[in-house]
Structure formats: C-alpha cells, structure tokens
Amino acid sequence: SRGLGDVYKRQDMRPFRFLAFVPTIIVLVVITYLSLAKNPVHSQEFYLFEGADKLVHGCMYLGLVWIGCFDIYRVSKFTAPKLILLVCGAIVWGGLMELLQGAMSMGRSADWYDFLANSCGAILGLILGVNSVPYLFRKCKKFS
C-alpha cells in the first residue's frame, strides 16, 4: 500500500507537500502568537512558581519539534539533514521571537533565558521524537 509520503513524491503533488506539515505549522503559528501578543493568557492573574515561564517555553518548543518529527516520519522517515534542519529551525525561530519581543513595544522584553529554554525544549523534543515516533507508528500499524 502506498503511504502519504509516496503521494507527496508524485510530480503533480509537489506544490502541495507543505500540507503534510499542517500540524507543525499550526503549532508554530500558536507559538508565534503566544510569543508576540501582549499578555495573551493574562499571566499576571496566576502565579505558579519562579521560572514557570521557562518551563512553558521549553514545553512549547519540545511540542513543536516533536510534532515536526511526527510529520517528517509520516511523510518520509527520518534523515539526519531533515532532523537537523527541524531542530535548528526551531532554535532560530525561538531566538527570532525573543529578538522581536525586545524590538516591539508591547510590554514584552527579550530574555536570553527564555531563548535557552526554547533551545533546550527543541533539543529534548528531537530526542523524544526520534525515540518515540517510530514506536508509535509501529504500534498503530499493529491495530490497523
């Protein structure tokens, strides 16, 4: 049986390859909104613990890269260049978000510890994705 990856390899489907990455794109848009909007979740209304925002940053980028791993594996399996591009892209995006927060006068500020949390989350997302996504696909194949 032909998989989704085979469909996007056809010449007539090449312009639509990005559609296979819609889940990753949606997560990226949500992260961008949360990073650049002025107080998007009214964070002053609740307090968890010191550094909770760093944990949130790490989890967002972990999720972004894990979903990216899922999309890559679903379409074409893992290759080192694709995974390196994914994690480096997420890290660069995290840095860009911090720079934009510093440049925009929206009551937000650039924080290099946020960038560090974004980067750590992206790397952990890659480790988690590479080790869990193939397993999940094998498990799902058993039930189909």
For each of these PLM feature ranges, what is it?
Residues H42-E50, G95-I123:
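Interfacial helix-loop-helix junctions of multi-pass membrane proteins
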Residues Y61-V75, C120-V133:
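Membrane-interfacial alpha-helical segments at the cytosolic side of multi-pass membrane proteins
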Residues M60, L85-L96:
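Hydrophobic alpha-helical membrane segments
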Residues R10-N39, W112-S144:
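Terminal transmembrane helix and immediately flanking juxtamembrane interfaces
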Residues S1-Y8:
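Short, small-residue-biased leader/transition segments that mark boundaries at the very start
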Residues D12-D71, L86:
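"…centered on the first transmembrane helix and the immediately adjacent amphipathic helix/loop
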Residues Y33, C69-Y73, M97, Q101, ...:
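Membrane-water interface at transmembrane helix exits
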Residues V75-C88, S144:
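Internal alpha-helical transmembrane segments of multi-pass membrane proteins
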